[in-house]
Amino acid sequence: MQSPQPEKSKPPVKMEQRGRILGIGGIFFKSANRDQMREWYSKHLGLADKGYGAMLPWREHDDPQKEHVTVWTVFPASTNYFPATQPFMVNYIVDDLDALLDRLKQEGVKIDAKRMNEAYGRFAWIYDLDGNKIELWQPAKP
């Protein structure tokens, strides 16, 4: 006789707060040998960066109809896109950039004044306690 298996429980359904992280939108790092580094990652790990990064698609767990992409790319060591002292930067996909920035401001998080609007979405940047720059991306509506 088998012992009964516990039922998998799900957390109670609650109203989700807007301005939350949905997933990782990008991993960016610097290299003094950008082209060779791209070739190495393509050859050995299959991350083929053809100029705009390797695109790694995924779907939301709670809404599989919503597809996103995580971008992996190598920047030149001289890039000003993120601070010289920072060898990498993580981009997080968010559901509501304005709501998140409003909440982070109230919580005293350091927020970069720069904003960027592109055809593929809106961007903002914040800093963690160690001063690491973090990119926030709200994708454009399809």
Which positions does each model-derived feature cover?
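Core segments of cupin and vicinal oxygen chelate
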Residues: 18-22, 28-72, 106
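Residue-level signal for short segments within beta-strands and strand-turn junctions
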Residues: 60, 76, 138-140
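A short, acidic/glycine-rich surface segment
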Residues: 11-12, 75-78
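Short secondary-structure boundary/capping segments
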Residues: 62-64, 79-82, 115
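Vicinal oxygen chelate
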Residues: 2-32, 77-142
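Short, acidic/polar N-cap/turn motifs at the starts of alpha helices
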Residues: 53-55, 89, 114, 123
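Membrane-topology and secretion signals of cell-surface/extracellular proteins
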Residues: 47-50, 83, 141
